[in-house]
Amino acid sequence: EAVRITRELMRIDTSNYGDGSGPTERPAAEYVVGELREVGIAATIIESKPGRASVVVRIAGGDRRRGGLVVHGHLDVVPANPADWSVDPFSAVERDGMIWGRGAVDMKSMDAMMLANLRRIAREAIIPPRDLVFAFFADEEQGGVLGADWLVSHHPALFDGCTEAISEVGGYSITLPVAGSNQTRRAYLLQTAEKGLVWVHLRATG
């Protein structure tokens, strides 16, 4: 199911150009809500601006005294120039056992896994040990101003009681040789820092 959802989400162009000219996240948000409603989960689209849509769903846990866990992804993607690709970046072609296209790694695949797990929770009437908040944000690729940042500022109650959060899978594993053998080992890198931004004004006299 996660593969199906990944491919269907990838075929929805949600390129974020940073200037408001993109197709917006609304179609992807509507897709998410449709997949949830199909299994009886009520979900609402929340817009920071017309078209800049996010979806947040809370699943009640068995012990409401425990801090809730936020599992979040983003629906927008970095723009893709078809001339730079060997496949249509929004076709979600399945080839060589992999799905090719924009969003396969960053991060519609995780969005799909979140959705698939939500659908399973609903179908099997699973009650998690603590509250789970699943969030599908807009605007991550341009700083989250119209997505996560806006929701936390304008709808903080959506995240009441949450104490941890996990997210971003915009990376990939690497294959490393095993010393003294012909074997290889797959390594999954762990991020220990986050990129930042600093403005520097330089003046040089020649």
Language-model features: locations:
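Acidic/histidine-rich catalytic neighborhood of metal-dependent amide-processing enzymes
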Residues: 105-192
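Acidic/His- and Gly-rich active-site-bordering loop/insert found
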Residues: 1-104, 123-130
